[in-house]
């Protein structure tokens, strides 16, 4: 299996001995040894995946990289975070998924209003199986644990990804204090309940709700 490691905080190095990985198209910045690159349609999920992604708007263009040596990946100087999966599922925005083991399965799932509040579509990308994945964030991501006793509220623009058995609810932060100018200015939050981990970035995207 390919070995993922960070070269600094913004470059992913993947050591391969005949292995293969799936990476965001155009993310390769350097390599040594012998590598072969092949563009994959539909996020590497075949014809069905391509049709699904076109219908859902959750576009993801990936390439397969296979060979012997080390390949280096980066995406616009974003911070890179490694996620080790052991049979569970990772939920991540397609734009934040940099690279995965080739054996990991990707797909799409419905997110409803949570995705719309982020300025994204109503669907998000899933990564499932056993292996490693690399995701990007604007600034070093913070990994926050959610338990049944301690749910978590996250600004939609700061959300990157999550794992575990979590339920999501979009809740409004608008109340009387907001209208009189004493509120937080955060129109919506995502409430996570259950057991799992949430990856949060220290930089907010522009969201539909914005600031009130």
Task: Indicate residue ranges for each PLM-predicted region.
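Phosphate/adenylate-binding glycine loop and adjacent helical scaffold
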Residues: 1-212
């Amino acid at each position: 299996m390919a070995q993922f490691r960070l070269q600094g905080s913004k470059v992913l190095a993947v050591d391969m001995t005949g292995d293969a990985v799936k990476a965001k198209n155009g993310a390769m910045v350097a390599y040594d040894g012998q590598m072969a690159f092949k563009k994959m349609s539909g996020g590497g999920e075949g014809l069905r995946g391509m049709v699904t992604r076109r219908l859902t708007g959750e576009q993801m263009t990936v390439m397969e990289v296979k060979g012997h040596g080390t390949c280096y990946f980066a995406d616009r100087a974003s911070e890179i975070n490694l996620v080790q999966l052991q049979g569970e599922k990772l939920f991540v925005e397609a734009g934040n998924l940099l690279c995965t083991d080739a054996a990991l399965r990707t797909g799409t799932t419905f997110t409803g209003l949570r995705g719309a509040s982020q300025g994204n579509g109503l669907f998000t990308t899933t990564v499932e199986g056993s292996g490693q994945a690399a995701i990007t964030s604007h600034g070093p991501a913070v990994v926050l644990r959610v338990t049944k006793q301690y749910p978590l509220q996250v600004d939609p623009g700061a959300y990157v990804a999550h794992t575990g058995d979590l339920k999501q609810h979009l809740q409004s932060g608008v109340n009387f204090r907001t209208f009189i100018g004493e509120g937080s200015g955060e129109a919506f939050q995502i409430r996570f309940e259950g057991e799992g981990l949430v990856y949060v970035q220290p930089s907010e995207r522009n969201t539909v709700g914005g600031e009130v």
